[in-house]
């Protein structure tokens, strides 16, 4: 059996799913740590927390001072990987609190989460995938009404593994008001944008609509029923693009989302 079809979890027992509705970030973080402490002692069950947060900025361990809001907006510093991001209404947040199979492979675990979200977005009709060196789910640069849009992230991933147990997880922009990202450098990436399912599909896509599919895909990916496949997006390099592309390419920092 290949690693792509093996379970990423230590336990063969089913994953428990908790729907927490809208919950403050610190309260959800406390719940994560409570569950993680149990799993580290081989107690309780692997659990997928699904929720929305009120608007909040959270900063991972690699956040630089220049990535933070310039207007003094409060930021919660957290112990996950990655940099700063925004959470808020219209964004599905998932925290799989999972004891990982040994030997622990954090990169493989992140690829499982990406695969689940790529599968959901693809089934909705969105062309998306991975970008080498950048976690999450991305859309390729594309031409929209004569204007080139940069690569843009529809789902972010940031995790921490402690005592063999994964915490934190992913966020999928459904019908979020994306202006929350304007005050920061999302994930510390300056040459790309942020988007949502609703923006890309041209219709309202709610958290409630996608939650069942995301739940099923995450469980399947972690259990090896949804194999990890190569799914990199096509990169547009404007230096080597056609004359037509080069002429139409805007300065990426001027492209606004939200």
UniProtKB/Swiss-Prot annotation:
Alphabetical list of Pfam families matching this protein: LplA-B_cat
Active-site residues (renumbered): 187
Function: Catalyzes the transfer of endogenously produced octanoic acid from octanoyl-acyl-carrier-protein onto the lipoyl domains of lipoate-dependent enzymes. Lipoyl-ACP can also act as a substrate although octanoyl-ACP is likely to be the physiological substrate.
Main location: cytoplasm
Top EC class, one word: transferase
Miscellaneous field: In the reaction, the free carboxyl group of octanoic acid is attached via an amide linkage to the epsilon-amino group of a specific lysine residue of lipoyl domains of lipoate-dependent enzymes.
Similarity comment: family membership: Belongs to the LipB family.
Keyword Aminoacyl-tRNA synthetase set for record: no
Binding of substrate, residues: 80-87, 156-158, 169-171
Catalytic reaction annotation: octanoyl-[ACP] + L-lysyl-[protein] = N(6)-octanoyl-L-lysyl-[protein] + holo-[ACP] + H(+)
Cellular localisation: Cytoplasm
GO terms for MF: lipoyl(octanoyl) transferase activity
EC number: 2.3.1.181
Protein name stated in the entry: Octanoyltransferase
GO annotation terms (biological process): protein modification process
Stretches assigned to the BPL/LPL catalytic domain: 42-226
Record keywords, A-Z: Acyltransferase, Cytoplasm, Transferase
Pathway where it operates: Protein modification; protein lipoylation via endogenous pathway; protein N(6)-(lipoyl)lysine from octanoyl-[acyl-carrier-protein]: step 1/2
GO cellular component terms listed in the entry, alphabetical order: cytoplasm
SUPFAM superfamilies: Class II aaRS and biotin synthetases
Site (Lowers pKa of active site Cys): 153
């Amino acid at each position: 059996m290949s690693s792509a079809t093996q379970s990423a979890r230590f336990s063969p027992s089913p994953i428990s799913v908790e729907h927490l509705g809208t919950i403050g970030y610190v309260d959800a973080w406390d719940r994560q740590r409570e569950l993680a402490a149990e799993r580290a002692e081989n107690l309780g069950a692997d659990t997928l927390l699904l929720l929305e947060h009120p608007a909040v900025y959270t900063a991972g361990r690699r956040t630089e001072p220049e990535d933070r809001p310039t207007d003094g907006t409060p930021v919660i510093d957290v112990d996950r990987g990655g940099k700063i991001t925004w959470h808020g209404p219209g964004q599905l947040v998932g925290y799989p609190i999972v004891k990982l199979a040994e030997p622990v492979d954090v990169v493989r675990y992140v690829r499982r989460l990406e695969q689940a979200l790529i599968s959901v977005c693809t089934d909705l009709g969105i062309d998306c995938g991975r970008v080498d060196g950048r976690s999450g789910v991305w859309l390729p640069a594309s031409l929209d009404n004569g204007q080139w849009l940069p690569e843009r992230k529809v789902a972010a991933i940031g995790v921490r593994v402690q005592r063999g147990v994964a915490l934190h997880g992913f966020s999928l922009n459904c019908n979020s008001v994306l202006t929350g990202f304007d005050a920061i450098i999302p994930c510390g990436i300056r040459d790309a944008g942020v988007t949502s399912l609703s923006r890309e599909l041209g219709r309202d896509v709610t958290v409630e609509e996608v939650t069942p599919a995301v739940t099923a895909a995450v469980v399947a990916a972690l259990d090896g029923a949804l194999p990890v496949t190569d799914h990199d997006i096509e990169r547009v390099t404007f230096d080597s693009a056609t004359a037509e592309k080069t002429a139409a390419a805007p300065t990426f920092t001027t492209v606004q989302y939200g």
